[in-house]
Amino acid sequence: MIRLGAPQTLVLLTLLVAAVLRCQGQDVQEAGSCVQDGQRYNDKDVWKPEPCRICVCDTGTVLCDDIICEDVKDCLSPEIPFGECCPICPTDLATASGQPGPKGQKGEPGDIKDIVGPKGPPGPQGPAGEQGPRGDRGDKGEKGAPGPRGRDGEPGTPGNPGPPGPPGPPGPPGLGGNFAAQMAGGFDEKAGGAQLGVMQGPMGPMGPRGPPGPAGAPGPQGFQGNPGEPGEPGVSGPMGPRGPPGPPGKPGDDGEAGKPGKAGERGPPGPQGARGFPGTPGLPGVKGHRGYPGLDGAKGEAGAPGVKGESGSPGENGSPGPMGPRGLPGERGRTGPAGAAGARGNDGQPGPAGPPGPVGPAGGPGFPGAPGAKGEAGPTGARGPEGAQGPRGEPGTPGSPGPAGASGNPGTDGIPGAKGSAGAPGIAGAPGFPGPRGPPGPQGATGPLGPKGQTGEPGIAGFKGEQGPKGEPGPAGPQGAPGPAGEEGKRGARGEPGGVGPIGPPGERGAPGNRGFPGQDGLAGPKGAPGERGPSGLAGPKGANGDPGRPGEPGLPGARGLTGRPGDAGPQGKVGPSGAPGEDGRPGPPGPQGARGQPGVMGFPGPKGANGEPGKAGEKGLPGAPGLRGLPGKDGETGAAGPPGPAGPAGERGEQGAPGPSGFQGLPGPPGPPGEGGKPGDQGVPGEAGAPGLVGPRGERGFPGERGSPGAQGLQGPRGLPGTPGTDGPKGASGPAGPPGAQGPPGLQGMPGERGAAGIAGPKGDRGDVGEKGPEGAPGKDGGRGLTGPIGPPGPAGANGEKGEVGPPGPAGSAGARGAPGERGETGPPGPAGFAGPPGADGQPGAKGEQGEAGQKGDAGAPGPQGPSGAPGPQGPTGVTGPKGARGAQGPPGATGFPGAAGRVGPPGSNGNPGPPGPPGPSGKDGPKGARGDSGPPGRAGEPGLQGPAGPPGEKGEPGDDGPSGAEGPPGPQGLAGQRGIVGLPGQRGERGFPGLPGPSGEPGKQGAPGASGDRGPPGPVGPPGLTGPAGEPGREGSPGADGPPGRDGAAGVKGDRGETGAVGAPGAPGPPGSPGPAGPTGKQGDRGEAGAQGPMGPSGPAGARGIQGPQGPRGDKGEAGEPGERGLKGHRGFTGLQGLPGPPGPSGDQGASGPAGPSGPRGPPGPVGPSGKDGANGIPGPIGPPGPRGRSGETGPAGPPGNPGPPGPPGPPGPGIDMSAFAGLGPREKGPDPLQYMRADQAAGGLRQHDAEVDATLKSLNNQIESIRSPEGSRKNPARTCRDLKLCHPEWKSGDYWIDPNQGCTLDAMKVFCNMETGETCVYPNPANVPKKNWWSSKSKEKKHIWFGETINGGFHFSYGDDNLAPNTANVQMTFLRLLSTEGSQNITYHCKNSIAYLDEAAGNLKKALLIQGSNDVEIRAEGNSRFTYTALKDGCTKHTGKWGKTVIEYRSQKTSRLPIIDIAPMDIGGPEQEFGVDIGPVCFL
C-alpha cells in the first residue's frame, strides 16, 4: 500500500475537489481566487500567514484557523523550530542528519530470524514456559465449596419403540473426502496468530448405511383426533315387518302444468305498451349491392391549405395558345452568319444576246452571186459558248408530298392540365355481387337482464356424484367420565386476569342525567319497497308552450328502424385523417363455384410491387483465395487499459530502501482469531503475597445457587418506588358476580352519540321518477368469442366514396397483337356467395323432444315482509373464554446476558453529529492586525431569538403612506357545508327540450269521435313542496363572492420602461385593388443587345414577291451589231434590301383590365406611437392581494473556521515485519547511540498537528460543496431542480422567488420562479405579464367569430414565459423538463373587458361568445363541451355591455401538463369601435 505524505494527499484532494464540483461557469483566476495582505491566492490554495495560523482559499473566501499544539510531556527543554508553531523535544543524537519522526503505534511482533542485535536492557517477565516434569504430589487441599447442581440422571429404560416418525429435513452437507487439502493457509505471522483457512474440497463418495439407532423414548400423549369420516353404508338389512299406517301426509306439490289449450281468437289490439328496452344489436348484415351514384353534392368549403405535395410528373404538352398581339419592331440585328446553300433552282430562261464577239479573220473574197433561191435548212451548227446567267425564274408548282419521315424523339411532357370538372353521372352499373362477409362487429353492450324464465320441467335424476371433500370436524363428543386424580402439581405461576364475570343484577335506577347533545343523523334507512301504482289523476288543462329546453342527454339507442331510402349525397366533407388500419377479418366460408366470367380487358400495368422478402441464406461458399496484403493502416487511438495481467515471477530482492515518512494512523484491524491455548507451564515457585488488587470489574452472573433456608423476618423497609409494569400474566379464572351497586350520582352530559344503526325499512315508497342517465360505465372485459350468427339482412347502401385523385400517367404501352385464343383454363376458385335465396316453406312440426335437463336455479325471490320480533330466548351458557388481554406495560429489564461473539467489522457509519466543543485552548500570542477584509455576503437569517421583555410603549408615530395594493389572492378554501335548507318551491319551468329521437311507429288507433273543445280550466293551487329529490350531481364551482370593501388607494406606480418591439405579426388580409396609375413616360432607348446565338436552320419560307428591277448598268463600248437573239428567260431574284429604320412609336393602347390582386406584401414597420390618450379615471381598487413572494434566500455564508481537532484515531493495523538484515553486522556498539533506540521506548511521541490542519480546511470546503449539491438552496449559484425538491429539503422555508434548473447541467440557464412552499408548486412568470387595455380589433363584418390575439390581431403576440435574461428557446427547454417532472398544472388568466363578453352572455343566457384559449400543444380549450378541454370561470364580470371596464378570471387545471402554459387567447365579442379589452396573464404553476 502506498503511503502518502501530506503534499501528495493535498494534490489528490485538490483533484477530488475539481471532480466533485459542478461547472460553475466562473473564471478560476477571477471568480475563485482570494486576496489577503496584497497577495493573490488561487482557489483551494493553503498557506500560513504566520507560524500558528493556517488559511485556505475557498471559492473566493479566505478561511483561517489557529493551529492548536499538544503538550510536550517528559521533555526538559522543548524547542520551537524556526517557522513552526509547536514545540518539539530535541534529542541528543548529534550524528543523525535529521530530527527523528514521531513514533508510531506499537506494531505487532515482527519476523526476525537469526540476527543478533546489541544487548538490550532486561526485558519484562516472559510468558509461561513449556510444561516441566511432573512435580511431587501436593498436600491434600481444603474441602471445596459445594458444587453446582448436578445434571439430570440417566434416562430410564427405553419404552417400546414408537411408530416411525416423518422423514427429517435434509442434513447439512458433509465434509468432503480430502480433508487434508482444506487445511490451507497455515499461520499468518503478521497478524499475530494462526488462521485456519478451510477450503471446501470435492464431495466424497456416499458412506455405507449406518446401523439402526436405539429406540426413541415413548412420545407424549397425543391430542384427541378429529372424528373420522363417515363409513361406507352397510349392507342393507332384511325387510322389516309392515308398520302401522302413518298419519295423513301433507298436501302434495302442485302438479305439472297441463298442456296448453287451443289458441283463443285474436283479441282487440291493446293500448300501446311502454317503450321496450332496446334489443341487442343485430349482427352486421351482408354487404348490400353497390348503390346508385348520388347527385353531385354542393361544393364544400375550401379546405385548409394542404402541405405542399411532391412534384408531379410532367404533363403532356398543352395546346398552343392564341396568337399574341404584334410586338413593336425590334432594332436592326447584326448581320447574321451566311446561311447554308439553298437548293438548286429551276433553269431560268435564256438571257439576252451577249455583246458581239471579237472580229474574226477576214474571209476569202466571195463571188458576188445573185441571190439564189432559198435553200433548205442547213445542219445544226456547233453549240455556241454559254451565255451569262439569266434572271431567276418564277417559282414552280409545289411538288408531290415526300414519303413520311421517321418518327421524331418524343417531346418533353407538358405542364399538367387543370383538373377537369366532374363528369356527368355514369349509367348505373349492374348490381354487384354481395361482398365477402365482414369481420365480426364490436362486442355489443350487454343487454338488460331478461325476464325470469318459467320454471323448467324437472330433469332426469343425475348420476351419483364423486365422493365429497372431508367434512368439517363434528361437534365435540359428550364429556367423558372424570379420570383418576393426578399427583399434586407444583404451584402454578400467577394466572392472567380472568375474563369478565357474568353481569351482576342491575343497580337501582340512577337519577336522570343532563340532556346530551343531539346525535348525528342516522344513516338513511334502506329504500322501501316500491308502492303500488296510484290511480291516474284527472287530466290537467293544457299548459302553455314552454321555452325550448336545453338539449337532453342522448336517449338509449332505439330499436333498429327500417332501412331508409338512400339519402341525397351530402356535401363533400374535408378529408379526414387516415384511420388506423383495421385488423384483418376472418376469411369467410368459400361460396359455391360461379360461372366462368368473360375475359377482362387488359389492365394498365400495375404499380411496382413491394420488395420481396429476403431470400434464404445460400449455402456456405468455398473459401476465397487469400487477398493481397493491405497497406498499413493509420495508427489507432490509444486503446483502453487492458485487464491486469497475471502476477509476474517474483523479482530479485531489491536493495534496502530509505525509510519512508511515517503514514497516517490507520483504522483498527479486525480482531484476530483466538490463538491456540499454550501448554501448561511448570509449577512456579510460590511468589510472595501480593498487595491487595484493585476492585475487579463485576463478574458475569453465576448460575443460581440452591435455594437457601428462609431468613428471619426483616424490618419493614421503606416504601419502594413503583416498579415498571410487568408483562401480561396468564388469564385468571372468572370472578364471581358482584353484588348490585349502589345508586350512582347522575352522570355528566354525554357526548353526542355515534350515528345510529340503519332504521327498519320504511313502508313501500311511491314509485320514484325515472333516474338520470348514469355515467357511462367502464367498458366491460371482452367477452368470449360467440358462435357465428346467421347472416343478417343486407345493410343500407353506403355513401358514395370520394373521387380518387388522378394518378400519374403510366408509360404508353405498345399495342400488342391480338393473341391466339388460349386453351381452356383450369376450374376457377369458388366464386363469391350468391344472393340469399327466398325462405323455404315452413316445415312440419318435429317430434316432441326428450325431457330437458334441469334448468338453472331461478333468481332469488323478493324478500318477504319482516316477521314480528321473537320472544327473548333463555339465557345462554357461559361464553368461551374471551381473547387474550391487551399487552401489558413493559416489564423490568432482564439480567445482563452473556457477551455475544465478536461481530464482523461493520461498514463505516455515516458521519456522526459533531461532538461537543472541546475546552478552549490557551490563547495564542496576539498577531499583527490583518488588513480589513472585504465585507462578506450577508448570512442567512438567524433563528428568531427568545422573546424579550416588553419595552415601554413608544410614542405614537405619524401615519405611514398607504402601501400598494397587493395582487389578487387565490380563492380561499371551501367553507364548511351549511345546514340543510328548507325544501324550496318548485323551480321555473325549464326551456323547451330538443325533440327526442323518433319512436317506433305504433299500430294505427281507431278513429276517435271529435270531442268538443272544453273551456280552459283555472290554474290549480300550488301543490305542497315535494319530497326531497335524489341528490343532484355537484354543481360547477360557484363564482366567487362579491368584492370586499375597497382597499385604500395605492400610490401611483412608476412609469414602466418602454417595451421592446413586438415580434412581426402574421401578414394581414389583402387590401382591395387600387385604381390604375397614370401611364408612365416613354423610357429611354435601351442599349443594343448582343448578337444572339445562331438559331437552328428554319424551314424554307414561301416564295417572295418578285423583286424590283435593278438599276441600269453603265453603258458598254458599242459593239458591232450582232444578230438579234431570241427573247431571254427571266433572271434570278435579287438580294433582299437592307432593313429600314425603326418607325415612330404607335399610339398608346387601351387601358388593360385590372390584374388580380398580388400577394400581400411583407408586414410594414410598426407605425409611430400615437399621442398618449387622456388619463383614465382611477380604477376601482383591487382586492387585497396575497402576501408577496419570499425574498431571495441569501447567498451561502462563508465557511466557518476549521473545527477543533478530532479525538485521536484508533490504533492502526499491525505493521509488517521489519527486515533487520541491514543491521545484522553491527554487533555490540561501543560508540554512538543504539540504532534501534527508537524502536524500543514505549512512550508515544506528540503528533504533529499542523500537517493535518491543511487537510482539515480542504475537507471542510469539500464537505460544504457536496452538502450544497445534496441539499440545494434555490439560489442562482445553487439552484434546485423544482420547488418540490426545495420543499422536501427545507420544509420550513417560506414561499417566495427561488432559482430552479429543471434540466440540471450547467447552472447558467437556471430561471427564477415563485415557489409555493405550502403546496410545493413551481410557478413560472409570463414575460410580458399583460396585454395593454385598448381597442385591438376593428371589423365591419356582421358575422362574429373568434379572433386569435397572437395569430390574427395586428400587434398581438403569443404569450411567452421565463426570465428576461433567458433566451426563449432556453426557457422552452426548461419548461419541457418541468412538465416532465410534474403531474398537474394550473393557470389563471384575467380578461379585462369594456363592452366585450368574456364567458356568459347574460342577454342570451349561453356561453356561445365565451373566450377560447390555446394550450402550448395547440389544443383549444373552451368554456363548454368535453370536460377535459374546458376551463372554469372563477369570477365573471363581463356578462353585458355597460360601457365600463370589468374583468373575468378564468382558470384551467389539467393533469396533462403538455397543455400548459396558455399561449394565446381568442375573444369573439370584439371588433366594434367601443369594444376594448386587455389581458393579465397569471403564472403557470406545476406540481
From Swiss-Prot:
**Site entry (Cleavage), positions:** 181-182, 1241-1242
The record lists glycosylation at 190, 287, 299, 308, 374, 608, 620, 1130, 1388
The UniProt regions of compositional bias labelled Gly residues, in chain numbering, are 360-369
Quote the biased-composition stretches of kind Pro residues, using this chain's numbering.
158-173, 208-217, 241-250, 433-442, 1069-1079, 1199-1216
Sequence segments annotated as region (Triple-helical region) = 201-1214
Q: Provide the Fibrillar collagen NC1 domain boundaries.
A: 1253-1487
Q: Per the similarity annotation, which family is this?
A: Belongs to the fibrillar collagen family.
- What the protein does? Type II collagen is specific for cartilaginous tissues. It is essential for the normal embryonic development of the skeleton, for linear growth and for the ability of cartilage to resist compressive forces.
* Name of the protein this chain belongs to: Collagen alpha-1(II) chain
What is the species listed in this Swiss-Prot or TrEMBL entry?
Answer: Homo sapiens (Human)
